[in-house]
Swiss-Prot record:
Catalyzes the transfer of a phosphate group to glutamate to form L-glutamate 5-phosphate. One of its GO terms (biological process) is L-proline biosynthetic process. Belongs to the glutamate 5-kinase family. It comes from the Bacteria. This is Glutamate 5-kinase.
Length: 372
C-alpha cells in the first residue's frame, strides 16, 4: 500500500451519506471539517484532490423533518435540492478556514456519456485543480430521476477518477474495509487487506445492500474500484472516521482495503466508451464474431450480427453482447439501428446494394471498440 498511495499526486476522495450526515442527523460539521483539514494538508503537499460527496438527500430529509427516505421521485428530488445548499455551504466554510477555495460541481452520468460534455467537464475540473481549488462533486439528483433510483456515488467517484486521470480513488465508508463476508452477520468473516481490483471473487464477497440513507453497499465499492482500475487508478476502501485517515494513507500507512489496478490503462477515447452506463442500443453477435473480437482483436462485421436491439444513430456508443446475454464489448456504431437491421447477417460486400450507400465495411471498427 505504501508505494501506491504515497506516490499518488492526483486523488479522488469519495465519502458516503451516512458519514457526511452522521447517520441522517444532518450535515456533520465536525466530520466535514476534519476531512477538509486533511484535504487542505494534502493540497499543501502539492497534491491535487477532488471530493465526491454524498449527503444531499439525507441533509434535505433532515431539513424537511422527514424521518424515512421517501419513495416518490419528486420528493427525493426536492430533498436533494434543499440538502445540496447546506452541503455546499459547509464544504465552502470548512475549506476556507484553511485558505483553500472550493467549487461545487454537479454531474449526471448523461454528462459523461456525451463526448463533448465529457471533455468540457474534464477541462473544467482540470482548470479548477490548476487554480488550487478543490472541486466538491455530487450527482445532480434534482434533475435526473433514474439515478436516484439506481445510481450511486461510488460509481461517480470512479467515473471522476477516470475523467481526470487520477492516481488513486479513496472511498471513505462506515466499515473498516472489505471482508470475505458480512462481519455483522458472520463472525468468521476475514478482513481483506489487499487484492487486485476486478478480481471476480471480490464481487461475490461484497454482495449485499447498503443503508437506507445511501444507495450503495460494499458491492458498489468493489465495482467502482474495478471501473477506476481501467484508467490506472488504485482504490482504497477505509473507515471515514479513522483519525487522519487521508494523511496517513498518503504517508503510505496500510489502512483499510487496497484494491490495486493491474489492468492495462485504456486510451482516452476508449476510457470514455467504457464509462458509459446507459447504452443507446445493443447488437447481439454469434459465437464466431465473439471469437474474432476477443481472440483476434478484429472489427465487428455485419455478418456476425444476429440481432439489433434499441434505437441508435451513427456514432452512438452501443453494447455488443453474445447470444447468452454476456457483454463482450462496446463501441461506436458506424450505422444507425434501422440500417444495422437491414445489413445484419449479410456480408460487407452487400451493404451498398442493401442501403444504396456504404459508410464502412464494419459495423464497429476495432479502433472504436473496447472489450468488456
Amino acid at each position: 500500500m505504501s508505494e501506491v498511495l504515497r506516490g499518488a499526486r492526483r486523488i479522488v476522495v469519495k465519502v458516503g451519506s451516512s458519514l457526511v450526515t452522521n447517520e441522517g442527523r444532518g450535515v456533520d460539521a465536525a466530520a466535514i471539517g476534519n476531512w477538509c483539514r486533511q484535504l487542505a494538508s494534502l493540497a499543501g503537499q502539492g497534491r491535487e484532490v477532488l471530493m465526491v460527496s454524498s449527503g444531499a438527500i439525507a441533509e434535505g430529509m433532515k431539513r424537511l423533518g422527514w424521518n424515512a427516505r421517501p419513495k416518490e421521485i419528486h420528493e427525493l428530488q426536492a430533498a436533494a435540492a434543499v440538502g445540496q445548499m447546506g452541503l455546499a455551504q459547509m464544504y465552502e466554510s470548512k475549506l476556507s478556514e484553511h485558505g483553500i477555495g472550493s467549487a461545487q460541481v454537479l454531474l449526471t452520468h448523461a454528462d459523461l456519456a456525451d463526448r463533448e460534455r465529457y471533455l468540457n467537464a474534464r477541462s473544467t475540473l482540470l482548470t479548477l485543480l490548476s487554480l488550487k481549488v478543490i472541486p466538491v462533486i455530487n450527482e445532480n439528483d434534482t434533475v435526473v430521476n433514474d439515478e436516484i433510483k439506481f445510481g450511486d456515488n461510488d460509481t461517480l467517484g470512479a467515473l471522476v477518477a477516470n475523467l481526470v486521470d487520477a492516481d488513486a480513488l479513496v472511498i471513505l465508508t462506515d466499515q473498516p474495509g472489505l471482508y470475505s463476508a458480512d462481519p455483522r452477520k458472520d463472525p468468521q468473516a476475514r478482513f481483506i487487506g489487499e487484492a487486485v481490483a476486478g478480481t471476480p471473487e471480490l464481487e461475490r464477497m461484497a454482495g449485499g445492500a447498503g443503508s437506507s440513507l445511501g444507495r450503495g453497499g460494499m458491492i458498489t465499492k468493489v465495482l467502482a474500484a474495478k471501473r477506476a482500475s481501467s484508467s490506472g487508478a488504485s482504490t482504497v476502501i477505509a473507515w471515514g472516521r479513522e483519525p487522519d485517515v487521508l494523511l496517513r494513507l498518503a504517508d503510505g500507512e496500510a489502512i483499510g482495503t487496497l484494491l490495486v489496478a493491474r489492468t492495462a490503462k485504456l486510451a482516452a477515447r476508449k476510457q470514455w466508451m467504457a464509462d458509459h452506463l446507459q447504452m443507446r442500443g445493443t447488437v447481439v453477435i454469434d459465437d464466431g464474431a465473439v471469437a474474432k473480437l476477443r481472440d483476434e482483436g478484429k472489427s465487428l462485421l455485419p455478418i456476425g450480427v444476429v440481432e439489433v436491439q434499441g434505437e441508435f444513430v451513427r456514432g452512438d456508443v452501443i453494447a455488443v453482447r453474445s447470444q447468452v446475454g454476456i457483454e463482450i464489448a462496446r463501441g461506436l456504431a458506424n450505422y444507425a439501428s434501422s440500417e444495422a437491421r437491414l445489413i445484419a447477417r449479410k456480408p460487407s460486400s452487400q451493404i451498398e446494394s442493401l442501403l444504396g450507400y456504404s459508410n464502412e465495411p464494419e459495423m464497429i471498427h476495432r479502433t472504436n471498440l473496447v472489450l468488456a
